Regions:
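Tandem repeat scaffolds
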Residues: 3-268, 273-277
Length: 278
């Protein structure tokens, strides 16, 4: 692996081997680090700043990224299954085709991330911010998405079946052909969203705000579901369904849980440290 240095950062230690040892600890700052294809299984990124890093196809199974900054980084086709990402900043990052199944990303910043075709089955993202994210074809079945910001997302053909999406903000999103079957949408805000071809079979919609939402082409909706939600004159529904008018202003509370304090790096011979050259 190459270990480039710059005026701002330098690698004090680096690996020449193809595989990076398990339980590696990485910290400090490294802008535009190249870690594509590396085996970083169980690695601990302890409050690190790895902005604009390239980790295409990297193995990060069970890695600890809590409190780190990976804004603008490329994780496409990477394996992050079971990774801990609480409170981390991934603004503008690319996770297209990546495996995030079972990952824990509560309170993470995922604004404008690309998750097209990603696997997030069973992932925990409570309190995360995915404003303007691209979720086209992503699998979020059985994921925990309570109090999450999903406003302005592009999520065509994504799978949210059996997901918990209570008290979340899905306003102005493109959810056409999405699978919401058996999902929990209680208290969620779907205002202004597009849901043509979306499947709501068995979804729970108690106190769901559908003002201005276009559900005219949605499938699996029943009057009993819609009767528990509320809307307005701009709400579009399938034929023969009616909705009661919302009273007052809908407020979605999305305060994320506090991120855990990153643990101290373990004592190990296999340590990568990135520090400022000052």
């Amino acid at each position: 692996m190459a270990c480039p240095a710059s005026a701002e950062t330098q690698l004090q230690f680096c690996y020449q081997d193809r595989d990076v040892a398990r339980m590696v600890s990485l910290g400090g700052t490294c802008n535009r680090c190249e870690l594509s294809g590396r085996d970083l299984t169980g690695a601990a990124f302890t409050g690190a700043v790895f902005t604009n890093a390239t980790l295409v196809g990297a193995n990060l199974r069970g890695a600890e990224l809590t409190g780190s900054n990976f804004a603008g980084s490329d994780f496409s086709r990477a394996d992050l299954s079971g990774a801990e990402m609480m409170g981390a900043d991934f603004t503008g990052a690319n996770f297209s085709g990546s495996d995030l199944s079972g990952a824990e990303a509560m309170g993470a910043t995922l604004v404008r991330v690309r998750l097209a075709g990603a696997d997030l089955t069973g992932a925990a993202l409570n309190g995360a911010n995915l404003n303007s994210a691209v979720l086209t074809g992503a699998d979020l079945s059985a994921a925990e998405l309570n109090a999450v910001t999903l406003a302005n997302v592009t999520a065509r053909s994504a799978d949210f079946s059996d997901a918990e999406i209570a008290m979340s903000d899905l306003s102005n999103g493109d959810f056409r052909s999405v699978d919401f079957s058996n999902a929990t949408l209680n208290g969620a805000r779907l205002t202004g969203g597009r849901f043509g071809g979306a499947d709501f079979e068995g979804a729970s919609m108690a106190r769901t705000d559908i003002r201005g939402a276009d559900l005219s082409g949605a499938e699996g909706l029943s009057q009993s579901q819609i009767s528990r939600a509320c809307g307005d004159a701009a709400t579009r529904l399938p034929a023969r369904l009616t909705v009661r008018v919302c009273r007052g202003v809908s407020v979605v509370r999305t305060t994320p849980p506090a991120a855990r304090t990153p643990p101290a790096p373990p004592r190990s011979r296999n340590t990568v440290v990135v520090s400022s050259d000052r």
